[in-house]
Amino acid sequence: EIRLSLVGSEMCIRDSFITAINDYIQRTRRYLSFDMEVIPELKNTKSLSADVQKEKEGELILKALQPGDVVVLLDEGGKEMRSIEFADYMKRKMNTVNKRLVFIIGGPYGFSPKVYEAAHEKLSLSRMTFSHQMIRLIFVEQLYRAMTILNGGPYHHE
């Protein structure tokens, strides 16, 4: 099973993004078991420092993980790949991961040290900074693209 875990709220995402994200999730499910879990955003964060906020979000992220999960952080400091390389990466993971493969998008300040320690890998979708809702959409689109590449679908063109 592939899982995308997100720190944040559905309330902060526009309907147009939700529609597009759900469309790619449904398309991707033709090829593999895929689920998206939203970890609730923290309340009353204005009084919290960035480090405290990362720690609290990190506790919620770690609580959502299961023993044996292979954890991949979507992080600006992670490895960058072209779409073809990501498809090959997914193929390797699907052939070797016995439990869940969990991709995590962090909160506005990134991840806590404990979440970095729990991670097996880091991937970057771009060196640019994107909004949380954009990253959700970009990731699910790239996951769908990877599945069509692996299955010979007409979606991807080189």
Residue ranges and their predicted role:
Residues 20-31:
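A short, Lys/Arg-enriched amphipathic alpha-helix followed by its capping loop at the start of a domain
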Residues 7-8, 32, 118-119:
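Short, structured coil segments at secondary-structure junctions
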Residues 106:
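Rossmann-fold NAD(P)-binding glycine/threonine-rich loop
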Residues 1-13:
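Single conserved hydrophobic/aromatic residue that forms the stacking wall/gate
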Residues 10, 69, 120:
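Conserved acidic residues
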Residues 113-157:
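Structured adenosyl-cofactor binding patch, chiefly the S-adenosyl-L-methionine
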Residues 14-19:
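Glycine- and acidic-residue-enriched helix-capping/strand-helix junction motifs
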Residues 33-99:
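S-adenosyl-L-methionine/SAH cofactor-binding core of RNA-modifying enzymes
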